[in-house]
Swiss-Prot record:
GO terms for biological process, alphabetical: translation
Annotated function: One of the early assembly proteins it binds 23S rRNA. One of the proteins that surrounds the polypeptide exit tunnel on the outside of the ribosome. Forms the main docking site for trigger factor binding to the ribosome.
InterPro entries the UniProt entry points to: Nucleotide-bd_a/b_plait_sf (IPR012677), Ribosomal_uL23-like (IPR013025), Ribosomal_uL23/eL15/eS24_sf (IPR012678), Ribosomal_uL23_CS (IPR001014)
Name listed for the protein in its UniProt record: Large ribosomal subunit protein uL23
Record flagged with keyword Ribonucleoprotein: yes
Gene designation per UniProt: rplW
Length: 94
């Protein structure tokens, strides 16, 4: 899998900002077929940082109403990437 296909986008929320500041953990939306090894390699090469560990979560899509009809949002995968001491990623400077 191509490095640019593994990571879709960073997740920037209040929770992820607090984790980034306190635990040096950054969060990404990643491809559903990507494994932890591919995610680690992609983050290290694209952002030039050292990764300590990767945790992943499969997020189920919610059922939503569209007028009278019901539909389902797509399932997706979230990755919590713990960076080693001295490494950091600033999404707004990239």
């Amino acid at each position: 899998m191509n490095l640019y296909d593994v990571i879709k986008k960073p997740l920037i929320t209040e929770k992820t900002t607090i984790e980034k500041d306190s635990k040096n953990v950054v969060s990404f939306e990643v491809d559903r077929d990507a494994n932890k090894i591919e995610i680690k390699e992609a983050v290290e090469k694209l952002f030039k940082v050292e990764v300590a560990e990767v945790n992943t979560v499969n997020v189920a899509g919610k059922v939503k109403r569209f007028g009278r009809h019901y539909g389902k949002r797509s399932n997706w995968k979230k990755a919590y990437v713990t960076l080693k001491e001295g490494s950091s990623v600033d999404f707004f400077e990239i």
